[in-house]
Amino acid sequence: MSKPGLREHTNFANDVKVYGPIGEQRLKEILTEKGHNFEDVSDIEEFRIFDIDILQYNNDETNSEKVLDAYYMGKTTSAADAVAYEVKTDTYGIVSRNIVFEDLSNSNSGCMARTKADYLFYVFVNKQNEIVEEYLINVKKLRWWLMSNFGKINQCDYLQSRSMRRGQDNTGIFLINIDHLINDKTSGALKLK
């Protein structure tokens, strides 16, 4: 029996294509409302390897090449006068109350472990594809929080590890309770909606 608001089956590759744009569009709306200059780089291959979807520029210039140059030189987006966002749209989080931190994917670093984004914009959507909750999470602080709580994995209710197999892909994830994360001021997580 399925839980209310939860789809019974999931297809990860399809979910990224179907649900991913919902969160990306919402972040673009927020940046537009705030008058920020930004660029959607989610379809640019060079940014996919860094798991970056949207660049917000701190001036009137949009120059994704400058950002790429900074990354390849081992610098951060601040060197390119930009802020980078990774967007996650989650159809299960409204029920589980967890965000997913993918640490391992197909024997490589998972997207959350390797992202060069400054912020994670994480949204929970319901069965009707409506955004129910929005979070902005500082990626560096989240990683620090995870390392600080590493000894508590699977020994508390707010941090669990799982391994999954999707076809040939072996995936290692951490399930982090979003409510706990929001209440822990060291986590870098902020609830927007």
Predicted regions and their residues:
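Catalytic cores of nucleic-acid endonucleases
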Residues: 10-14, 39-40, 47, 88-134
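Short, solvent-exposed secondary-structure boundary motifs
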Residues: 55-62, 102-106
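Non-catalytic C-terminal interaction segments of nucleic acid-processing enzymes
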Residues: 3, 11, 33, 57, ...
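Acidic-basic catalytic patches of nuclease active cores, encompassing PD-(D/E)XK
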Residues: 1-59, 91-92
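Beta-rich catalytic cores
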Residues: 66
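Conserved catalytic cores of phosphodiester-cleaving nucleases, focusing on short active-site segments
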Residues: 31, 54, 70-93
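Short, conserved, surface-exposed binding loops centered on an aromatic residue
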Residues: 62, 71-77, 110-114
